[in-house]
Amino acid sequence: MNILLFGVSNVGKNVTGKLLAEYLGYTFFDIDQAVKEELGITLEEFVSTGPLLERDRLRCDIIHSLTYSKANKVIAVTPLSYIQDIIPLLSSPNVMAIELKDSAGNIFKRLVFSDENDVIYQDDDYKYAHADYYLSEIQKDLEWYGSIYTILEHHFDISGRTPEETANALIETFHLKEV
């Protein structure tokens, strides 16, 4: 079984995905990390190369290659604007695609930053000084990606849960222990 977690940045795909994989005994993959390994460049460099369509196609190719193997896995999917290359995959019997959602305010609380070397750091002073901007951008992302992810069969509202609570709720809601 391949569990694909979709959602906006900072919604909790990676942390929840790692826990979900651990609880189920699955392998965890992060599409951002897979892109870095595939191309040998940082994400900062990657997002500065070529048009978004080409970058999303590469991400979709990586998703295809990961789901091709029969091993059970959880895959945290980078926000994708162009998902047409994986639409047939989403209806595959060995794929469960789930959009993780939460409010802009809850996502803002989890907001972290990364430097040019992809080192993640937290800067709450900066974050809160620019709260209006970030909340607005998060809301725009929720609306944009929400419109794209309407084709996904499964949607899950995190509702401010912790990653542990979210992983357990996903297992219960989607009967993942039985899959």
What are these regions (language model features)?
Residues 14:
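Walker A/P-loop
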Residues 11:
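ATP-binding Walker
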Residues 19, 96, 143-179:
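NTP-dependent small-molecule kinase module
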Residues 56-96, 100-101:
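Glycine-rich phosphate-binding loop used to anchor ATP phosphates in small-molecule kinases
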Residues 22-64:
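Conserved substrate/cofactor phosphate-moiety recognition/catalytic segment
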